[in-house]
């Protein structure tokens, strides 16, 4: 397990900033799910900068940052700009023109699939860090890893803003190295 004690806003650890600016929404998108709304975090200039700085320390030296749609892509784009790398958005099914590579997965509240372009990118041998907002069951990170490995990319790890430890997603995607900025 990778722990970070990164500071922002004076000396507050980034995990405290994330926790203070995350809104819990009960029964969304369906009953029994506790949704982590990171909108207040992303809208706060200083907190978002602290998150990106922490992720930049983790992803330094990577060739490409891959963000999982939609909130993971938002974070990945900011991170790629900070690192001076390219960014790849791993999209929800049906959002890209063909041909695409598709990977199916199960998530906390149903099955889904994700896609990347099949022929417009050369990823073979490139080091890629996957970025997502929340690690829950590990379904999306696992699928993203499988999808990128099919292209020949070298997935160096993943980083998430929030990890929901009770759902044991980290165990589901082992041995993928996962960095969490905060845990709930």
Curated annotation (Swiss-Prot):
Reaction it catalyzes: AMP + diphosphate = 5-phospho-alpha-D-ribose 1-diphosphate + adenine
Keyword Transmembrane helix: no
A GO CC annotation given for this chain: cytoplasm
Pathway(s) where this gene product acts: Purine metabolism; AMP biosynthesis via salvage pathway; AMP from adenine: step 1/1
Main location: cytoplasm
InterPro entries with a match to the protein in the record: Ade_phspho_trans, PRibTrfase_dom, PRTase-like, UPRTase/APRTase
Keywords: Cytoplasm, Glycosyltransferase, Purine salvage, Transferase
Residues annotated as transmembrane: none
Keyword Cytoplasm (UniProt): yes
Coiled coil: none
Enzyme Commission designation: 2.4.2.7
Pfam families (UniProt xref): Pribosyltran (PF00156)
GO BP term, example: purine ribonucleoside salvage
Enzyme class: transferase
Disulfide bridge map: none
Gene3D superfamilies referenced in this protein's UniProt entry, alphabetically: 3.40.50.2020
Gene Ontology terms for molecular function: adenine binding; adenine phosphoribosyltransferase activity; AMP binding
Record-linked HAMAP family: Aden_phosphoribosyltr
Family label: Belongs to the purine/pyrimidine phosphoribosyltransferase family.
Subunit structure: Homodimer.
Protein function: Catalyzes a salvage reaction resulting in the formation of AMP, that is energically less costly than de novo synthesis.
UniProt xrefs under PANTHER family: ADENINE PHOSPHORIBOSYLTRANSFERASE
Name under which the protein is recorded: Adenine phosphoribosyltransferase
High-level lineage: Bacteria, Bacillati, Actinomycetota, Actinomycetes, Mycobacteriales
Gene from which this protein is expressed: apt
